């Protein structure tokens, strides 16, 4: 499982939704495109 950090507001103090700086997240499960290490 991947650890996801959820924060209230951005690092700059703005109250906005800012995903943690990471690679793109695929919500749809694609069994033909499983990333290595899974």
Curated annotation (Swiss-Prot):
Cofactor(s) recorded in Swiss-Prot or TrEMBL: Cu(2+)
Protein name: Plastocyanin
GO molecular function, a single term: metal ion binding
Family (UniProt): Belongs to the plastocyanin family.
Keyword NAD annotated: no
Keyword annotations of the record: Chloroplast, Copper, Electron transport, Membrane, Metal-binding, Plastid, Thylakoid, Transport
Organism: Thalassiosira oceanica (Marine diatom)
Membrane topology, as annotated: Peripheral membrane protein
Statement: the UniProt record of this protein carries the keyword S-adenosyl-L-methionine: no
Principal place of residence: plastid
Function: Participates in electron transfer between P700 and the cytochrome b6-f complex in photosystem I.
Positions that bind Cu cation: 25
Tree of life domain: Eukaryota
């Amino acid at each position: 499982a991947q650890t996801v950090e959820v924060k209230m507001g951005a690092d700059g103090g703005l109250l906005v939704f800012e995903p943690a700086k990471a690679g793109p997240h695929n919500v749809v499960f694609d069994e033909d495109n499983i990333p290595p290490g899974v």
